[in-house]
Regions:
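C-terminal amphipathic alpha-helical interaction region
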Residues: 396, 404-466
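Glycine/threonine-rich flexible loop motifs
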Residues: 67-84, 99
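Small-residue-rich helix-loop
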Residues: 343-375
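Rossmann-fold dinucleotide-binding core
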Residues: 79-83, 96, 102-213, 220-245, ...
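Hydrophobic beta-strand scaffold residues
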Residues: 29, 51, 120-121, 274, ...
Length: 466
């Protein structure tokens, strides 16, 4: 029997859909799952795909060099699966990890398998269940030789916008690193949109239907994006039992899988400010403290000015500008961190290509990526695209609307940590002088840490108490 083109391990919904995507594009596919029941269920629905029930049978079903795609839960499950494969694979075979693995884990696995002559690729896959089936965004890192064995098939199953939304992004953990940044930006944008929803419903007292109409208008202009599209879908859904908007019945306790936290932690490690992403992570942490928040609301007798007249008549226009500016800043922080990481980890990430492939298939696809792509085409070494003239002009135009929104939120007592952090970041980034001189003076006084001067070179220390 002729060997299968690709093998997929892990038959969760994402794994099943990727297997079908490969099959729909003309590739012969073999699958394996840790539990036989899941494999049998899938095989019953899709007999054209080869079902296997042991790892040796799975590996022997594949043509050489073998191409194995893992879609298992990130962490120990990936290591366990790799451990079961290593004695069965041969030099030159390719193993692709399509889960949300932490990039240092990918670096380690890549190094370990390289010693065995096996190419290990960290493959970031974005697009959710539908993207996995119809065309995701695919971010690949690892040995280039390994990518050369699978690049064509990955291009074919990827979303297609200005070419395949699949790109080789660099060695070792580069692919999973870029996927981590993608997820950090995703956290930030979701939080910004949620804050807009909160302001409109709590301070503006708009109905869910009215907010949906506002978002629809925004999505027809510069805020056009996948996340805005699904925000509209969420607001359209009615609970069949109560006939109320389903979103209003959902407990306000947001969960997270950790990729946003990884982004913030890495930003701290590299010394790159990402306050909007940080605020989004912290906001989910705060939401988890539901019982404490209820107690605090009662003990402090929290009162908010939620009357509709507390917001100006053209507030939705101002808020649109603030949301747009905050989303631009969210992307800017992510790309800035990516730039620092690319240099620090010697990835050589092609930022123009990252912006391009994010335009299709992925969760953060948005109209603004066209402008981001143009910025990097004009200057491939741009540290932060807020330095690009087009973005500088855009944020200047949105400045007043941004500030008016923050002011209205403060007066209404509605927290907008991500929008607020975005504006603070923008003001800080464009400040020629910050109060760090005062901080350095304090550090020198209590800890003799020294300081630099603006009028002459060198490191200085003063006796502040004499």
């Amino acid at each position: 029997m002729e060997g299968k083109d690709v093998g997929l391990i892990g038959l969760g919904v994402m794994g099943q859909n990727l297997a079908l995507n490969f099959q729909n594009h003309g590739y012969s596919v073999a699958v394996y799952n840790r539990t036989e029941a899941k494999t049998k269920e899938f095989a019953g629905k899709h007999p054209e795909i080869a079902a296997t029930y042991t790892l040796p049978d799975f590996v022997n079903t594949l043509s050489q060099p073998r191409r194995v795609f893992l879609m298992v839960t990130a962490g120990s499950a990936v290591d366990a699966t790799i451990s079961g494969l290593t004695n069965l694979l041969s030099r030159g075979d390719v193993v692709m990890d399509g889960g949300n693995s932490y990039f240092p884990d990918t670096e380690r696995r890549s190094s370990e398998l390289a010693k065995l002559g096996i190419h290990f690729l960290g493959v970031g896959v974005s697009g959710g269940e539908e993207g996995a089936l119809k065309g995701p965004c695919i971010m690949v890192g690892g040995p280039k030789e390994g990518y050369d064995h699978v690049g064509e098939m990955l291009d074919r199953i990827a979303a297609q916008v200005d070419g395949a939304c699949c790109q080789y992004l660099g060695p070792r953990g580069a692919g999973h690193y870029v996927k981590m940044i993608h997820n950090g930006i995703e956290y930030a944008i979701i939080q910004v949109i949620a804050e807009a929803y909160d302001l409109l419903t709590r301070a503006g007292r708009l109905s869910t239907r009215h907010v949906r109409s506002v978002f629809k208008e925004w999505n027809e202009r510069e805020l056009n994006s996948f996340l805005m599209e699904i925000a509209i879908q969420v607001l359209e859904k009615t609970d069949p039992e109560t006939k109320r908007p389903l979103v209003s019945l959902i407990l306000d306790r947001a969960k997270q899988k950790g990729t946003g936290k990884w982004t913030s932690q890495n930003a701290m490690d590299l010394g790159i400010p990402t306050p909007t992403i940080d605020a989004a992570v912290a906001s989910r942490n705060l939401s988890a403290l539901k019982d404490q928040r209820v107690k605090a609301a009662h003990i402090t007798k929290a009162r908010r000015k939620t009357a509709s007249h507390s917001l100006p008549g053209n507030f939705t226009e101002r808020l649109e500008g603030a949301v747009r500016a905050s989303i631009v800043v969210s992307y800017a922080q992510g790309f800035h961190l990516m730039s620092a990481a690319s240099e620090n980890y010697q990835y050589g990430i092609p930022f123009t290509e990252v912006a391009r492939i994010w335009k299709g298939g992925c969760i953060i696809r948005a109209k603004v990526l066209d402008s981001i792509s143009r910025a990097f085409q004009a200057n491939a070494n741009l540290e932060n695209f807020l330095l690009d003239p087009e973005f500088a002009a855009t944020l200047t135009r949105l400045d007043k609307k941004w500030r008016d929104t923050v002011k209205c939120a403060k007066l209404a007592g509605v927290p907008i940590p991500a929008i607020d952090a975005s504006l603070d970041y923008y003001d800080g980034y464009r400040s020629e002088r910050l109060p760090a001189n005062f901080i350095q003076a304090l550090r020198d006084l209590f800890g003799a840490h020294g300081y630099e001067r603006i009028d002459k070179p060198g490191q200085f220390h003063s006796d502040w108490l004499s």
